[in-house]
Regions:
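Short glycine-/aliphatic-rich beta-strand segments at the starts of folded cytosolic domains
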Residues: 8-19
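Short hydrophobic/aromatic beta-strand micro-patches
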Residues: 16, 58-60
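Short amphipathic alpha-helix segments
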Residues: 20-40
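Helix N-cap motif at beta-to-alpha junctions
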Residues: 21-22, 60-66
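Short amphipathic alpha-helices in soluble, non-transmembrane regions
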Residues: 27-32, 68-77
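Conserved short beta-strand edge segments in small beta-sheet-based binding/regulatory domains
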Residues: 40-43, 78-89
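A short beta-turn/loop motif at secondary-structure boundaries
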Residues: 46-51
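Short, low-order "capping/linker" segments at domain edges
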Residues: 54-56, 90-106
Length: 106
């Protein structure tokens, strides 16, 4: 399935990913940052198991294509657990806290 959000596409994508030890986070970050439309990649490893690492991957760009990112991750042996944030449109909107968020995670 191809995810398109108008002409500007996705501008920020935050993924929870399970990846093997190899390739390294450096190699994975460089591979993702070389995809068309991507301007920056940030990978944080938040858990290490015996054979895999859990990573939060933040990708920003002018035209981030979800399916292209997913395919590259799969080629490198990684699996997307969840899509934690998507921002699209002409302007990036930051999340703001509201009174309803007191018990919610943001």
């Amino acid at each position: 399935m191809l995810y398109r959000v108008g002409p500007s596409m996705i501008r920020r994508l935050v993924l929870d990913v399970l990846k093997p030890y190899r390739p390294s986070v450096v190699d994975l970050s460089l591979a993702l940052s070389n995809l068309d439309g991507i301007e920056g990649v940030n990978i944080i490893i938040y858990e290490i198991d015996q054979h895999v690492e859990n990573a939060k991957i933040t990708i920003v760009g002018t035209e981030v294509e979800f399916d292209v990112v997913k395919k590259k991750l799969e080629e490198m042996g990684a699996t997307i657990h969840s899509v934690d944030e998507v921002a699209s449109g002409k302007k990036l909107i930051e999340a703001v806290k509201t009174p309803q968020d007191v018990s919610a995670r943001i």
